[in-house]
């Protein structure tokens, strides 16, 4: 790959407090070499070609926080490879997947499978959630500590809400004790 130069872009990077018009230089290995208003036609070697973005945006990768993926169980609809190709084409570099799969993501063996498949097949970062309750039934809590130790980033029952207030209270206490993220649909 040859070095690439981009100019006249709206660059937005909240992490680095950048919100300006400028350019971007990407080296031969795909690594960003320079970014910002100092990158313009004045500092691009005359023999090099550049891409004028004419005000289009350059941003860090987008994270989709609520993705229902078909894997496992509904691969005929979508799998990690097709999901990641579609999202990557739109600038999404990371997704948080919901536990509404078949089987439901509610135990460590499914989490192991999911993380392995995501690592092997996806071209983007996959961050799985597990269900709050076993089999998404709203009656028995999943093992937050074990699931979190396996790499689950949060817990949700997807589109379902917990109707049992005692159970929800137990869930919130456990989440607090373990510093777990709870994503509840309302």
Question: Where are the regions that the model predicts?
Answer:
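Active-site metal-binding motif and surrounding structural segment of the metallo-beta-lactamase
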Residues: 40-58
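Metal-associated gating/positioning segment near the N- to mid-region
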Residues: 56-118
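N-terminal metal-binding scaffold of metallo-dependent hydrolase/deaminase domains
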Residues: 1-44
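Histidine/acidic-residue-rich, glycine-tolerant segments that coordinate divalent metal ions
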Residues: 101-112, 117-186
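Divalent metal-coordination and catalytic microenvironments
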Residues: 9, 24, 30, 55, ...
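A short helix->loop->beta-strand "cap" motif at the edges of active sites that frequently abuts
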Residues: 48, 92, 179-180
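Hydrophobic/aromatic beta-strand patches that form the interior of the parallel beta-sheet core
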Residues: 6, 49-51, 63, 96, ...
